[in-house]
Amino acid sequence: MNDLFASTNFGTEKLLEKELLSLGVSDIKIIKGGIYYKSNDLLLYKSLMWSRIASRIYLCIKIFTINNIDDLYDHVYSINWTEIFHIHNTFLVNFKGTNNFIRNSLFGALVTKDAIIDQFQNKYASRPNVNLIEPDIRIKLVLLNNNILHIMLDLSGEPLNKRGYRQFYNTTPIKENLATAIVLSSGWNENTPMIDPMCGSGTFLIEAAMISSDRAPGLKRLKWGFQFWKKYNKNLWKKVLEEAEEKFKIGIKKCFQNYFIGYDYDPEIIKKAKKNASNAGVLKIIQFLTKDVNNLKNVYHKEQEGIILSNPPYGERYQTENKLVGLYVQLGITAKKYFKNWKLSIFSASTFLLDFLQMQSHEKYFFKNGPLNCIQKNFLIFFKNSSITTNEFKDRLNKNFKKLKKWINSEKLESFRVYHADLPNYNIIVDVYDKWVVIQEYQAPKSIDHNKAFKRLCDAIYYTKEVLSISINNIVLKTRIKNKNKTQYKKLFNSNDFITIKEYHAKFLVNLTDYVDTGLFSDKRLVRKLLGVLAKGKDFLNLFSYTGTATVYAGLGHANSTTSVDISNTYIKWSARNMSLNNLTSSQHNFIQYDCLKWIKKTNQKFDLIFINPPTFSNSKKMQQSFDLKRDYLDVMIHLKKILRHDGTIIFSSSTRNFEINFNCIKKMQLHAKKITNKIQSKDHLKNSNIYHSWLIKHIK
């Protein structure tokens, strides 16, 4: 009998146990990450051929206790390696674990290698070579409890998840053995259809089709670790291989065609999935089609039951989570609308995104996918008419969009607002950025029922997609939390993904995910346009310049010079990129990273046109003291007056609710202020006249 160890992914041990028992294996002992078992040579070969769950299968050679380096060398040398592999075979030692005398695993591997080579050298006056890339023989040592060493021979060669069929894949797919574990945990019945609406390289469907057609996972593998083992029984392996081939020939004929359907929005990915399925020999029973989740429908008759199984993107793979909520909302609604009495099984690393399915799971399984802790949730789909005919948010959004559409087209705008907390039950903002939509949710107070608020948010996401004809994949969700610390900006993610938005004759880089704000305020659109008109031949100063959008207009308006000042290095760099995007790169355009309040006190420069759009409050760590607009604006005006030329103009803009400047105080400074809010308020921001304010300020002559 052979003493063996089958390693597996964490969380799949019970599935591996069931699999090995079905093959006839006995004396099983489960540990975390694998199973010890005994078998004869026939069952050994069968477990290698048929295990869909195991990662590798090892022959356990010896377990011993080591107290020093000499013990390690002596115990390894005591094993008769010349009876295990030939001198002409290459080998590799993998050592796992450390203690007080084996400080790193490479040292442990080196001592082991020396002992093996010395044994061959002493017996044959020659030695086998080490191959770090593709060795014939792989020797594994695992150090447990500081001094208990397990030494094993890897009979698999390459990991067993490498079935040989998946030569084409996108990014980092789930390993085949983990995919099988997910399939087996999903509640799938082999006699019912399986649909993967985001199939990628097709792994779930191919593994399920292999199970259904009795196709052994090891059937296509050409090279195995045991083939270089001296005890390799070639005839017995041939028998196992021929038996597996015969089972597949019979099994594939019994399978129903089109019981496996895979969709993906990318035709190139679908081509790869088809090639993989063809390599596995199961393409004839899988249908791959180019289609996104928006267009997912049930193609089977009403009484047919089946399963939707998928591993949607969850932030780690492609995008940040806030870009993916719409995808999960759409998937949940589609499942409930078209797949009555089906099952839904979703594998994800994000419980946050899974909540947007708006479904209650009846089963949960926990797995490790590489370094990620993942969860598989299984749902029973009961009929629910998700196509609500009347919804107040949908009606209001539709009304707003129709009202604005003609104006949007005439102005040729790519960025605009279509909804701003119009309804008490839908306290959100909806902004359009070309083909993208950003939905900003104001965090509901604790007095509001969380489930109701969450349901309304999901409805808003879905109806935004419907009304604006936007791809569900192009909706970004953000939550605006009441800022107790009152810091101005906070980085949320680090995607560094930018899109270009056109506004009249200007272009801007916009980031929809990484910050609370995107880099472009649509409410300041006409202020920017006015600055472009006023800037011709002027020296222009932009204070609290943010991403420099106002500076771009001044530059395009042929300003004599521009100066942008902001305390944030991130936004100064962003400003420079926006200027470069508009071919404004000459030395007349200056960017200064500095505290604006300190800079206006110390500068000796004079300006013809000054734009200031200060925050309501700021207490940046880079500032010596906090800034409060209502408290400090008059002090700021005193210093602005000193740097404003005699015929100069200040455009003072604010987004602070109900803020008004004191005209009498301004007059005492020998300045004249005129409110111009009505002249520069865009049609998509008319409902917020108490928030957006602008004044034109000049010297009294």
UniProtKB/Swiss-Prot annotation:
Gene Ontology CC annotation, any one: cytoplasm
Localization, UniProt: Cytoplasm
Keyword Ubl conjugation: no
Domain THUMP positions: 43-155
One Pfam family hit: RlmL_1st
Statement: the UniProt record of this protein carries the keyword NADP: no
SMART domains with a match to the protein in the record: THUMP
InterPro entries found in the cross-reference section: 23SrRNA_methyltr_KL (IPR017244), DNA_methylase_N6_adenine_CS (IPR002052), RlmKL-like_Mtase (IPR000241), RlmKL-like_Mtase_CS (IPR053943), RlmL_1st (IPR054170), SAM-dep_methyl-trfase (IPR019614), SAM-dependent_MTases_sf (IPR029063), THUMP_dom (IPR004114)
Reactions catalysed, as given in the entry: guanosine(2445) in 23S rRNA + S-adenosyl-L-methionine = N(2)-methylguanosine(2445) in 23S rRNA + S-adenosyl-L-homocysteine + H(+); guanosine(2069) in 23S rRNA + S-adenosyl-L-methionine = N(2)-methylguanosine(2069) in 23S rRNA + S-adenosyl-L-homocysteine + H(+)
Gene3D superfamilies in alphabetical order: 3.30.2130.30, RNA methyltransferase domain (HRMD) like (3.30.750.80), Vaccinia Virus protein VP39 (3.40.50.150)
EC number: 2.1.1.173, 2.1.1.264
UniProt keyword annotations, A-Z: Cytoplasm, Methyltransferase, RNA-binding, rRNA processing, S-adenosyl-L-methionine, Transferase
Principal location class: cytoplasm
Enzyme class: transferase
GO molecular function annotations of the record: 23S rRNA (guanine(2445)-N(2))-methyltransferase activity; RNA binding; rRNA (guanine-N7-)-methyltransferase activity
HAMAP family tied to this protein: 23SrRNA_methyltr_KL
Function according to Swiss-Prot or TrEMBL: Specifically methylates the guanine in position 2445 (m2G2445) and the guanine in position 2069 (m7G2069) of 23S rRNA.
Family: Belongs to the methyltransferase superfamily. RlmKL family.
Listed name of the protein: Ribosomal RNA large subunit methyltransferase K/L
Organism field: Buchnera aphidicola subsp. Acyrthosiphon pisum (strain APS) (Acyrthosiphon pisum symbiotic bacterium)
